[in-house]
Amino acid sequence: MNYDFDTVTDRKNTNAIKYDLAKKRGKPEDAVSLWVADMDFPTAPCIQKAVAEKAAHGIWGYSRPDNRYYDALKKWYKERHNFEVQNEWVVNTPGVCFALATAVKAFTNEGESVLIQKPVYYPFFNITNSLQRKVVNSSLILKNNHYEIDFDDFERKIVQENVKMFILCSPHNPGGRVWTKQELQKISEICLAHNVLVVSDEIHSDITFGSNVHTVYGSLSEQALKNSIICTAPSKSFNLAGLQFSNIFIADEKLRKAFSEELDKTGYDEPSVFGIVAATAAYSEGADWFDSVKSYIWENILFAKKYIEENASQIKVLVPEGTYLLWLDFSKTGLSDSEINDRVLNKAKVWLDSGSMFGKEGEKFQRINCATPRIILEDALKRICSQF
């Protein structure tokens, strides 16, 4: 089936934070918004149909997933990731960040250490800090436009800081790495050796390109499976973030019980009725749409790389192995981080995520969302390149 990803859908005045928060956050209201990680495409027709039918039913009371959801979820992970999910492993939460916070509260105490790898998705350290845990950082190493893990530093920090939990970003946001099985196995070996629980944020796991293959952390070994909390959701793959629905895989019964007990303390019980319906439709009927949108996004990424190389060659493009996020390196411009931010936001009038939001290691970088109609992406690139 052919899908139209070129038509622009006006999202202004729809309560979309990507567009309607500009004034509140002091951003130019005429800026092109490519900051937050949601798509500018309507979701798959099969999902729209399923949600519309549920809306027409008119009764949206407390709901829980049934076997249609579990069967679709298991089929998706088996076919896409060769990972066999068991029904009892699945805990639903209203978002992956909610699950991260729940895990930090359930498995660490105030003052204990949680390891992350900057530059990284900023809720990792914002949530950890807000819960009065100690953030320990093992910075990724950038070599030839490619991030690598410093395993010596990784293990040293775990030992020195008595780390209790490691939050893994897989695939990596914002750097776009799809970690190899060998890299993940090394992480697992170190964490198992030092009794460090792994919380793996795999929300972008479906979105990989070329020969890059996502490895579900729990597929590494039985020990890795039982020492991990794997956070997944249909939100990035199918543009469903606003429905607040995630699938958290916890194979170990004791971990799952502790996580669920912490979840209960928040007052959260049943997931969104529309989240259940949308996720079920996505995983059971959405494959063709997803494959099409992923191809379109990859074409956008290649378009952006070529455009920047031809019009602002001092900006270096880190081509992602996964995610629809492009990480742009402005360090060769000779400008300071604040000067780069000012040129992009106030002169080019493009609202991106400043790299410094992801940690000091992200200074002089900008993150741009490529899940948008090409005409919007081209407009943003023209504006940016005109200032550098």
Language-model regions, residue ranges each:
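PLP-dependent enzyme catalytic core of the Aspartate aminotransferase-like
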Residues: 334-336, 343-352, 358-388
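N-terminal small-domain helix-loop-helix segment of the aminotransferase-like
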Residues: 2-95, 102
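Helix C-cap/helix->beta junction micro-motif
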Residues: 131, 161, 193-194, 311, ...
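Conserved core segment of the aminotransferase class I/II
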Residues: 49-50, 222, 226-298, 306, ...
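Conserved glycine-rich beta-strand-loop-beta hairpin in the small C-terminal domain of fold type I
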Residues: 280, 296-305, 317-330, 362
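Conserved core of the PLP fold type I
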Residues: 60-189, 206-207, 214-219, 223
